[in-house]
C-alpha cells in the first residue's frame, strides 16, 4: 500500500523549508522514515516477505546517505531532524 497522498502532503507541509519545497533533505528523509515505519509494521505480520525486506534495506541505506549528507552540510539541521523524527544517530 504505502503512504497515502494525504499523509504525504502532511509530511511535506510539516518538514518543508520554504513554500514550494518538496526535495530538501529534511522532506526526503521524513518521507523515507514514514515508508520505513510502514514496512516495519508490514513485516510484523508478513515475516516471509523477503522481496519487500530487500526494498526496506535499500531504503534504510538511502536514508542513511541523506542523513550523512545533511550532517556534513549543516549539523544543526541534522540534530533537529534526528530529534523530531526520533531516529538513532
Curated annotation (Swiss-Prot):
**Main role?**
One of the primary rRNA binding proteins, it binds directly to 16S rRNA where it helps nucleate assembly of the platform of the 30S subunit by binding and bridging several RNA helices of the 16S rRNA. Forms an intersubunit bridge (bridge B4) with the 23S rRNA of the 50S subunit in the ribosome.
- Tell me the superkingdom of the source: Bacteria
Name of the protein in its database record: Small ribosomal subunit protein uS15
Please report a single Pfam family linked to this protein: Ribosomal_S15
Q: Does the keyword Cell inner membrane apply?
A: no
Single GO biological process annotation from the record: translation
So what family is this one in? Answer: Belongs to the universal ribosomal protein uS15 family.
GO CC, alphabetical: cytosolic small ribosomal subunit
What taxonomic lineage is listed for the species of origin? Bacteria, Pseudomonadati, Nitrospirota, Thermodesulfovibrionia, Thermodesulfovibrionales
- UniProt KW keywords: Ribonucleoprotein, Ribosomal protein, RNA-binding, rRNA-binding
GO MF terms here are:
rRNA binding; structural constituent of ribosome
Keyword Ribonucleoprotein tagged:
yes
What SUPFAM superfamilies does the record tag this protein with? S15/NS1 RNA-binding domain
Instruction: Indicate the quaternary assembly.
Output: Part of the 30S ribosomal subunit. Forms a bridge to the 50S subunit in the 70S ribosome, contacting the 23S rRNA.
